[in-house]
């Protein structure tokens, strides 16, 4: 009997502002781990989260592991 893929999966969200910063003036890249429902959100997840390196709320996008 085959098992189905889990509906809820863990995803990693990464700050787009820190990741695309060409000057590398920030000390690091902000990352959050959260869960998403694969059926309800089949596309990549984007949330506004607080980035301690940018010192403000920025868009965090889902990245591949």
Curated annotation (Swiss-Prot):
An MF annotation (GO) of this entry: structural constituent of ribosome
Gene3D superfamilies: Ribosomal protein L33
Xref: InterPro entries: Ribosomal_bL33, Ribosomal_bL33_CS, Ribosomal_bL33_sf, Ribosomal_zn-bd
Disulfide bridges in this chain: none
Entry keyword set: Chloroplast, Plastid, Ribonucleoprotein, Ribosomal protein
SUPFAM superfamilies attached to this UniProt entry: Zn-binding ribosomal proteins (SSF57829)
Record's GO cellular component terms: chloroplast; ribonucleoprotein complex; ribosome
GO BP terms: translation
Top-level taxon in the UniProt lineage: Eukaryota
UniProt-annotated location(s): Plastid, Chloroplast
UniProt-listed NCBIfam families: PRK00504.1, PRK00595.1, rpmG_bact
HAMAP family in the cross-refs: Ribosomal_bL33 (MF_00294)
Family: Belongs to the bacterial ribosomal protein bL33 family.
Protein name listed in UniProt: Large ribosomal subunit protein bL33c
Lineage: Eukaryota, Viridiplantae, Streptophyta, Zygnematophyceae, Zygnematophycidae
Gene: rpl33
